């Protein structure tokens, strides 16, 4: 039984590692162009915790983990996160554009 558990652990380790890093790596330069076009109106404001209208809090996404950003954008797109503006924007993005934006913001 002990050998079985060890063998199973060794066999599953690469699978679990891959699952955590399965988000495709994007192109930061392409992400910057997309960010300027659609994201900077809210996320590009100095002091990113407020934007127009001031009642909405805009999170700081610069320096955030790229995988987290992709997951968050997908959550907006499929309705798991509730923000109509972000849902509309995320729904218009291709998978490669999600990865590009995430790569750009993760390097800020």
Predicted regions and their residues:
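A structural feature that tracks compact, well-ordered secondary-structure segments
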Residues: 59, 71-76, 89
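Stable alpha-helical elements in mature extracytoplasmic
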Residues: 35, 65, 72, 82-85, ...
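Soluble non-cytosolic domains of exported or imported proteins
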Residues: 29, 33, 63, 92-96
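C-terminal capping alpha-helices of c-type cytochrome domains
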Residues: 67, 78-81, 89-108
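Sec-dependent N-terminal signal peptides
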Residues: 5-13
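Periplasmic/extracellular electron-transfer cofactor-ligation site
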Residues: 23-26, 32-58, 78-85, 107-108
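Residue-level hotspots at or immediately adjacent to binding/recognition sites across diverse folds
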Residues: 2, 20-25, 89, 104
